[in-house]
Amino acid sequence: MPLNRTLSMSSLPGLEDWEDEFDLENAVLFEVAWEVANKVGGIYTVLQTKAKVTGDEWGDNYFLVGPYTEQGVRTQVELLEAPTPALKRTLDSMNSKGCKVYFGRWLIEGGPLVVLLDVGASAWALERWKGELWDTCNIGVPWYDREANDAVLFGFLTTWFLGEFLAQSEEKPHVVAHFHEWLAGVGLCLCRARRLPVATIFTTHATLLGRYLCAGAVDFYNNLENFNVDKEAGERQIYHRYCMERAAAHCAHVFTTVSQITAIEAQHLLKRKPDIVTPNGLNVKKFSAMHEFQNLHAQSKARIQEFVRGHFYGHLDFNLDKTLYFFIAGRYEFSNKGADVFLEALARLNYLLRVNGSEQTVVAFFIMPARTNNFNVETLKGQAVRKQLWDTANTVKEKFGRKLYESLLVGSLPDMNKMLDKEDFTMMKRAIFATQRQSFPPVCTHNMLDDSSDPILTTIRRIGLFNSSADRVKVIFHPEFLSSTSPLLPVDYEEFVRGCHLGVFPSYYEPWGYTPAECTVMGIPSISTNLSGFGCFMEEHIADPSAYGIYILDRRFRSLDDSCSQLTSFLYSFCQQSRRQRIIQRNRTERLSDLLDWKYLGRYYMSARHMALSKAFPEHFTYEPNEADAAQGYRYPRPASVPPSPSLSRHSSPHQSEDEEDPRNGPLEEDGERYDEDEEAAKDRRNIRAPEWPRRASCTSSTSGSKRNSVDTATSSSLSTPSEPLSPTSSLGEERN
């Protein structure tokens, strides 16, 4: 089922800019979501990073609508007076009728204006509004589902606010209301039921039923067409939530999803084909290290190494300079996030490294928040021992240095037998004795509340990865979000990612996947799957993703065992790379950040808003989509500088020199010439394929007149890439060649 986008990103370096043709002077955008200034999940990141781009387009006519939370307002919002008379009258009217509505500025980049609705203060109207929802939409909400009840309150308050704003506006604006996820979907349904003159958009970032089915060990993607959705939702006691989500999808003027894979899922589960796919982006400037990300990687890796020294005290029998750091992070959904596949692949990798006598060691981190009651005592002790050893070494070093200085000052060579006295040797022996431990280093850094049934810990027991000296793969489960104030691993998430070598995200259900995207913009290679939105997006736009450090694991057309074997192959091949090859690969990975910038991906949202305006106000706006063939898009070519496969890339000399491994000097090519990052970056960017089609979406406004420009066709440089761009995978059901 091909699902072409109605707008292409045509402004990557070397391509023409796409100009906005709509007159938005008398248009207002309200973006409604439960995670406005309220961090719960990934939608918070979407709104936070997209705010600046949307604000640049809409200016002061852009508002975010979300729930009022005391914690969120205290730490993220500056309360202000309403900037316009119409908005002030709207807030005053609602507050005078028993609601509590707050207005302010979200303290993030772009500083968007926010309207916060106090859901708890309106609980007095819950039963009446639930009755109205039943009469209007035939959706009943049980009393015990607090989240669904909050969705009802939030939806009615949002509709009340939009209706009041339209009533209080002297010059009736063209209002666009963009609703994210089912928690905000009730408001969309009510806007259509009450016939408010509002252009509505509904974006689902993941379907409710899809997430529940995948978590239940169901062969989800092979049975999408066969599910009895009402029966499945009812058995999982989420039928009322499913009805809210499905109603919002059908009521919206424009329905969007975040990825091609989720679009197919939504068509079968929600019974509506999305109008457009709106991929998630990132604020790339935030992660830009100005060509210093290699140095930042080294600095962050040193912080991780300090933790490893303490965690493995007494068993630090591996070379930290030959140690790679892998990690998986995200919501603790054991099978959905692919932690089961990752653990199995680590066990197989451990076997391969041992039987092949590899000197490489892998430390795999699992950063997934779970229920804990405290830090593990052994883990805390390890960091304390490490700090004590450091203090002891510094004390001895100072005494040694002072005696050496005094000896040289009088013009004689020091007597090495007198440099350290008996007290110094006693101190060092005590330090060595403190590093002795009988048990293996702990697998988990915290005390788990359900240790016996925790899926990660039970799997580790089954595969036998206990951090023994014989293991080449070590496992560390950190069941808590990373923080720079932690007494164990005092780094924030961004710094931790920069210090690792590879992010592993073998997800079975991942509508988009921000974690591999964040790795990409920070120049860290990652493993994703062809069942994640990010993985499909990269396969579509990159001719050879693995050459750029984006490994795509096949979890669609392979069995679970075959997927584990493929992941093991990826991991083992990565371990075989030299430091030089990893540096080159990180340079290429960071170069892909342009693909994920909201500056370009935000245009999908722009297209969705234009489509909604043309459907809601056809007398004022027209939208003429010009669908292009999927194969006419652009693709990053395969890099021509160095073969991406470690097995095909050899050193120019039997042993690497220190100069060769220094990232500041740049790695050497096969012919001995220095690898130039800037030159390679320019070469790759020159060879981005230009689209050979007229602009896909042509929008006109009756108020501003019609103006249509076609994108000039650009020619790409001739590299050793295929003469014709490869077409992206159009459907999950199609076999790949």
Curated annotation (Swiss-Prot):
One Gene Ontology term of the molecular function aspect: glycogen synthase activity, transferring glucose-1-phosphate
Biased composition (Basic and acidic residues): 682-695
The reaction(s) this protein catalyses: [(1->4)-alpha-D-glucosyl](n) + UDP-alpha-D-glucose = [(1->4)-alpha-D-glucosyl](n+1) + UDP + H(+)
Tissue: Expressed in skeletal muscle and most other cell types where glycogen is present.
Biased composition (Low complexity): 715-737
GO biological process: glycogen biosynthetic process; heart development
Chain segments carrying region Disordered: 634-737
Gene3D superfamilies for this protein: Glycogen Phosphorylase B (3.40.50.2000)
Modification type Phosphoserine: residues: 8, 11, 412, 641, 645, 649, 652-653, 657, 698, 710, 727, 731
Keyword entries, A-Z: Allosteric enzyme, Diabetes mellitus, Disease variant, Glycogen biosynthesis, Glycosyltransferase, Phosphoprotein, Transferase
Residues binding alpha-D-glucose 6-phosphate, per UniProt: 291-292, 294, 297, 301, 501, 582, 586
Primary role: Glycogen synthase participates in the glycogen biosynthetic process along with glycogenin and glycogen branching enzyme. Extends the primer composed of a few glucose units formed by glycogenin by adding new glucose units to it. In this context, glycogen synthase transfers the glycosyl residue from UDP-Glc to the non-reducing end of alpha-1,4-glucan.
Family: Belongs to the glycosyltransferase 3 family.
Protein name according to UniProt: Glycogen [starch] synthase, muscle
Species whose genome carries this gene: Homo sapiens (Human)
